[in-house]
């Protein structure tokens, strides 16, 4: 089944509202209508879902999101992996593609939504206290945890998966509306990390790690 090029379902009410405002604005003043129409086009742009060619290497772990790597750090992950892990934090600006993708194939084993604050996503402590959604995926090689985190502008997390779902690598997990951060936790002893702080990555394309062995 082909994915839509624009996530119309998730952006439906934004597009309807702006479509109506475009017509009303044009009736009042041409330039006002044009301004609202440009905003309408930006929202279409924001909800875009470009086609991605997923790497076939079964040991490759791909980025779950587009954006810039904010940090790569060794941590102790306590929600799902429950042990030593490498955390890769990816910041998404409002101009990035905002869908999240499965970094590996496997079964969704864990989903947990935690309420919190809405601090700017680039703040270091935002990842600890902002609202977020945890998605744990398991396959015969490893367990991976993806965390969708809200930001100051991004206040709506959409998840497409539930426990028990079987995912293909690169399959859509969900999206975060209007700027955000996505984190991925990889088991430290199992994975070789291939990205570094400041690097731009692309969801479904960039190989951020490889399973050892």
UniProtKB/Swiss-Prot annotation:
Chief localisation class: membrane
Membrane topology per record: Peripheral membrane protein
Lineage top rank: taxon: Bacteria
Site (Cleavage (non-hydrolytic)): 179-180
Keyword terms, alphabetized: Cell membrane, Decarboxylase, Lipid biosynthesis, Lipid metabolism, Lyase, Membrane, Phospholipid biosynthesis, Phospholipid metabolism, Pyruvate, Zymogen
Cofactor: pyruvate
Positions annotated as active site in the UniProt record: 180
Cellular component aspect of the GO annotation: plasma membrane
Cofactor note: Binds 1 pyruvoyl group covalently per subunit.
GO BP of this protein: phosphatidylethanolamine biosynthetic process
EC annotation from Swiss-Prot or TrEMBL: 4.1.1.65
Subunit structure of this chain's protein: Heterodimer of a large membrane-associated beta subunit and a small pyruvoyl-containing alpha subunit.
Role of this protein: Catalyzes the formation of phosphatidylethanolamine (PtdEtn) from phosphatidylserine (PtdSer).
PANTHER family named in the record: ARCHAETIDYLSERINE DECARBOXYLASE PROENZYME-RELATED
Name of the protein: Phosphatidylserine decarboxylase proenzyme
Organism: Carboxydothermus hydrogenoformans (strain ATCC BAA-161 / DSM 6008 / Z-2901)
Taxonomic placement: Bacteria, Bacillati, Bacillota, Clostridia, Thermoanaerobacterales
Gene: psd
């Amino acid at each position: 089944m082909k994915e839509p090029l624009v996530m119309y379902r998730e952006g439906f009410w934004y597009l309807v509202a702006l479509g109506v405002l475009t017509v009303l604005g044009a009736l009042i003043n041409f330039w006002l209508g044009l301004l609202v129409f440009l905003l309408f086009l930006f929202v279409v742009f924001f909800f875009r879902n470009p086609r991605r060619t997923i790497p076939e290497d079964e040991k490759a772990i791909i980025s779950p999101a587009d954006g810039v790597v904010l940090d790569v750090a060794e941590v102790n992950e306590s929600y799902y992996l429950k042990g030593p892990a490498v955390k890769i934090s990816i910041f998404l600006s409002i101009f990035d593609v905002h869908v999240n993708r499965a970094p590996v194939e496997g079964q969704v084993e864990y989903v947990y939504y935690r309420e919190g604050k809405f601090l700017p996503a680039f703040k270091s402590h935002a990842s600890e206290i902002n609202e977020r959604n945890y998605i744990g995926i398991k396959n015969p090689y490893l367990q991976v945890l993806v965390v969708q985190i809200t930001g100051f502008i991004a206040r709506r997390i959409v998840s497409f998966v539930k426990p028990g779902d079987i995912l293909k690598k690169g399959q859509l997990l969900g999206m975060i509306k209007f700027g955000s951060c996505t984190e991925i936790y990889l088991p430290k002893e199992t994975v070789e990390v291939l990205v570094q702080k400041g690097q731009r990555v692309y969801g479904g394309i960039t190989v951020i790690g490889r399973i050892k062995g």
